[in-house]
């Protein structure tokens, strides 16, 4: 085997590794609504797609009816009913498209009159007792959503006959706070009522300070959080943590995973290129040494060769 063979073999392996790394599936971006995915009619909202650095092209699309824009954000100056629905985004690097982002549900609120929210038997509850929060709508809606200020999740109950009950079993200090509810029809899941007036639940016997009145921006909604809570006794739990959060405040930094993957790929490329250069230099040195050795051997053989006999006088 010639000295250059291992060099080209190592170069081939390195280049193949780089190609495999770069041709794998691109990580999915994140899609966020700013300031919130709950948008009152007439208000503005920005949908922003965030991916890794140096993206060639972004695509932001609305599902059903399908339409898209080749940009990383969508500004809606005035929220209308037609803007509500499911959105997702993706990006392109070279000839490869990324996986689509998680779907974001953009909700139009204030489409219908607000429901009323009350606590029974009272909004002042002794610790350890039970209380039921009742959300009642003037319309025959079959879906109700309850929010607690400070919680990122929501509690959803499919009900009929204009109202829904949200029982809280064995009240603790964690249940104190400000609540409000929405109502809507399952046939139009992205068109919600206006929020109810806030209800402050006070757990007596505790030195807890009531929370401030919430705003709609405090309540991000995700596809997972709008599903019914999986609780055996249908009680509200403030310890439940959501799986995903699609709405976020202004100025959120890009996800760490994208930068980490991009940095790792860049490191791998640099390491392979550095190793390739070193291997090439070693191969050239070995080939030069081999050539010099052969030349020296030829000279030695020439010196050791017997001289021809002298011609006879």
Curated annotation (Swiss-Prot):
Per the UniProt topology annotation, the Cytoplasmic ranges are 287-313
Region Disordered, as annotated, extends over 213-236
What does the record give under GO molecular function?
Answer: collagen binding; collagen receptor activity; protein tyrosine kinase binding
Keywords, sorted A to Z? Blood coagulation, Cell membrane, Disulfide bond, Glycoprotein, Hemostasis, Immunoglobulin domain, Membrane, Receptor, Repeat, Signal, Transmembrane, Transmembrane helix
The main place the protein resides is: membrane
Q: Which residues are glycosylated?
A: 93, 244
- Asked if the Swiss-Prot or TrEMBL record annotates the protein with the keyword Repeat, the reply is yes
Which ranges sit in the Extracellular compartment?
22-265
* Self-association state and partner proteins as the record states: Associated with Fc receptor gamma chain. The GPVI:FcRgamma complex is associated with the Src kinase family FYN and LYN. Interacts with TRAF4. Interacts with COL1A1, but not with COL4A4.
Please report the name of this protein according to its UniProt entry: Platelet glycoprotein VI
